[in-house]
Amino acid sequence: MEAASSSLDSFFLDVSLIYLYAVVSDRKGNIMLQKLYVFFMKETVLSIAVILALLSMFWVRPDKDYFTYIDFRTLGLLFCLMAIVAGLKAVGVFDILAKKLLMGTSGTVGVIRLLVLLCFFLSMVITNDVALITFVPLALIIVHKLPKELGNYWLLKIVAMQTIAANLGSMLTPIGNPQNLYLYAKAGMSAAELITLMLPYSATALILLLIWIQVAAAKAPHVCGSEKDKTLLGFSDRKELNMEYLAAYLILFTICLLTVARIIPYQIPLVLVLIYMLLRNRENISRVDYSLLATFIALFIFIGNLGRIPQFSSFLERILAGRETLTAVLASQIMSNVPAALLLSGFTDNYRALIVGTNIGGLGTLIASMASLISFKYIAKENRNLRGKYLGIFTASNIIFMIFMLILYFFLR
């Protein structure tokens, strides 16, 4: 009887242990799924790029040719530029520059105009996403200094204006955005050629932005005493510039520009930036957008593998032939303009058309340019209830600008 009882106890103990193991495993599985979901939502483009790269490996097994897919020059330059700009931002260069410019500006409309133009012009040098990371929070601070009615009027409009300004300003230079940097290197163009190609679009965009600001200002509610209103109080007091860091990053930036101009090889700035950060400014290493670099690598693998699948390669080449710009515009609406540039460049050598198409393609949907998501996140953080209204203003404005850019494209072709 005791043996039977002991056997029964042992049975229930085994069942309990199995159940406990199943529960723990299930919980671990759920935690893992939750982590994957959070990562996917946070890094959607990277996640999709990795999935596509892995799927393509079923058709083209990994081999030594995979290394030929990677454009190490573009990756090296992108890393250097992100590290240098992050360093300059951490030093406080952009805050000080903006403060000095705003000190010479009077009136609400003047301040709004300056905040938009800062995004437009500085995006040409510090990239569109860094311009938005720097100046959208500043715009939100300043808007909150305005009388409530006036602040509510400008809040969503100025962020939409800044986003469009950063995307359209960045298209003028090779270092303004990642797709320009990649396609410029791929095409073997000179900086002057790219600037000449995109100048009509940037000039038109600037005129449209200034008109938009004036039209919006004319419709703004008139509130007494709504001028500058101590706007500069939004700036936190910063310690003095670290001149060593400033000088070092400016020298490194100059070396990067020489690399962009193909005067020196990319390995030189890459080694110098790494040595300087490791020896003098290690915390800056964490400020680099490694997810963007990983996205590039995954897409290089995906595109390289597609190029080795004859059926797909010939199909995409037929679709692109003579329609490179419009295809790039449409592809950007779905997958964003950087992945579109990487994908389509593997199946055509008409890089000039892709440069125009992916830059115009940065307008339109919220994901057409990943930089646009930065502004959206700031609005969501400001007030989640404003997301829908902002999306409406942003999308309508983007479509209007895209129509003008496409009209200009058909006129110039």
Describe every region a protein language model picked out.
Residues 21, 25-46, 52-55, 217-251:
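Intrinsically disordered, low-complexity non-transmembrane regions of multi-pass membrane transporters
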Residues 33, 192-238, 373-413:
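Juxtamembrane and boundary regions of transmembrane helices in multi-pass small-molecule transporters
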Residues 36-65, 77-92, 216-218, 255-283, ...:
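Structural signal for alpha-helical transmembrane segments and their membrane-water exit/capping regions
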Residues 69, 91, 95-98, 251-349:
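Transmembrane helical segments that form the transport core of multi-pass membrane transport proteins
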Residues 72-74, 103-116, 146-158, 243-247, ...:
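Membrane-interfacial loop-to-helix junctions in multi-pass transporters
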Residues 102, 108-109, 157-161, 289-298:
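Cytoplasmic-side transmembrane-helix entry/capping segments in multi-pass membrane proteins
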Residues 109-114, 148-161, 191-198, 351-359, ...:
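Membrane-interface alpha-helices at helix entry/exit sites of multi-pass transporters
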Residues 121-171, 182, 342-355, 384, ...:
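Hydrophobic transmembrane alpha-helices that form the pore/transport pathway of multi-pass ion
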